[in-house]
Amino acid sequence: VISDVQFNKIQGLIQKGIDEGATLVAGGIGLPDHLDKGYFVKVTVFANANNSMTIAREEIFGPVITLIGYDTEEEAINIANDTDYGLAGYVSSGDMDHAKDVANQIRAGQVIVNYVGGNSDTPFGGYKQSGNGREKGVWGLHDYLEIKAITGF
């Protein structure tokens, strides 16, 4: 990661996940085993988490994933939307119409369906506390424009 501040923030969140009872599947605190300096974070996976845990509620911005189980699609959508943030989401389905329906219910600036990421033409940006500006594509150009309305002719 970019700095000791971000490294320490991520390390604190990983520790918080452990302290709050999530199952540490991979990774954890500290540098990767083959490194003794730098701001490298171990790829970390938590399972058996719930949406009340800090690691599920914060944008970690590091190689940390929190897995939360669900029983119904409605519950999954509620979990996805029960956050102060909304940068991105992911939907996987063999039925594209159904996937689009689910994606439309997720309050995030970008929802990826059956794909590894967006492309350079799609706008990227968040909802809620993840921000509301857009980068990339035609929407990204709006930040560089000054709009003028002329009325009364």
Q: Where are these predicted regions, by residue range?
A:
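Short beta-strand to alpha-helix junction loop
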Residues: 1-11
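Conserved C-terminal structural/oligomerization subdomain of aldehyde/semialdehyde dehydrogenase
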Residues: 14, 20, 33, 37-153
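Cytochrome P450 fold signature focused on the C-terminal beta-domain
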Residues: 23-33
